[in-house]
């Protein structure tokens, strides 16, 4: 059996079996304890969390600043690379144009040289053919004259004509 010391009605320290009164007293004790002891504990946790969040924000801002600077530097480098590429492209165009003009000039000069050479060869061949035709015509004329003259000329006139023909052939 339960000893009478546990009951409050007996006048000693005991258990209060009235649940509503007991719960109100217990809630008052718990609320007072939470009010007294919880703020420093929860405040410390919240303060540490606030410091961590501020540190994370500061770190994120620093990384954003570095990334922004890196992006600006990369954009500047890209612009410089585009400018250099454009300069190289322009230089190549100018060089290609100079090479093309030089090639055209050399081609025209070579064509003129070949034309002069062909003209000189043609003139030389024409001169040679003309000289050969003159010699052949002179030879044939002399042969015809010599074959026709023996009956028409005397020996002195014939000798003089042969000498003059030989002299003319030597000059030609």
UniProtKB/Swiss-Prot annotation:
Asked if the keyword Thylakoid belongs to this entry, the reply reads: yes
Keyword set includes Acetylation: no
The subcellular location is: Cellular thylakoid membrane
Q: List the disulfide bonds.
A: none
GO CC, sorted alphabetically, is: plasma membrane-derived thylakoid membrane; proton-transporting ATP synthase complex
Q: How does it sit in the membrane?
A: Single-pass membrane protein
Describe the protein's quaternary organization and the partners it interacts with.
F-type ATPases have 2 components, F(1) - the catalytic core - and F(0) - the membrane proton channel. F(1) has five subunits: alpha(3), beta(3), gamma(1), delta(1), epsilon(1). F(0) has four main subunits: a(1), b(1), b'(1) and c(10-14). The alpha and beta chains form an alternating ring which encloses part of the gamma chain. F(1) is attached to F(0) by a central stalk formed by the gamma and epsilon chains, while a peripheral stalk is formed by the delta, b and b' chains.
Q: Belongs to which family?
A: Belongs to the ATPase B chain family.
The protein's name is ATP synthase subunit b
Which organism encodes this protein?
Answer: Prochlorococcus marinus (strain MIT 9303)
């Amino acid at each position: 059996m339960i000893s009478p010391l546990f009951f409050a009605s007996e006048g000693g320290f005991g258990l209060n079996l009235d649940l509503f009164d007991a719960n109100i007293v217990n809630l008052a004790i718990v609320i007072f304890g939470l009010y007294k002891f919880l703020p420093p504990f929860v405040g410390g946790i919240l303060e540490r969390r606030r410091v961590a969040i501020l540190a994370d924000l500061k770190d994120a801002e620093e990384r954003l600043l570095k990334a922004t600077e890196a992006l600006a530097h990369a954009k500047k480098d890209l612009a410089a690379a585009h400018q250099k590429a454009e300069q190289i492209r322009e230089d190549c165009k100018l060089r290609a144009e100079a090479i093309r003009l030089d090639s055209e000039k050399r081609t025209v000069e070579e064509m003129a040289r070949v034309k002069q050479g062909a003209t000189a060869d043609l003139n030389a061949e024409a001169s040679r053919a003309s000289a050969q035709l003159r010699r052949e015509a002179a030879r044939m004329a002399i042969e015809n004259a010599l074959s026709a003259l023996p009956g028409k000329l005397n020996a002195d006139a014939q000798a003089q004509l042969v000498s003059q023909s030989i002299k003319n052939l030597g000059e030609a």
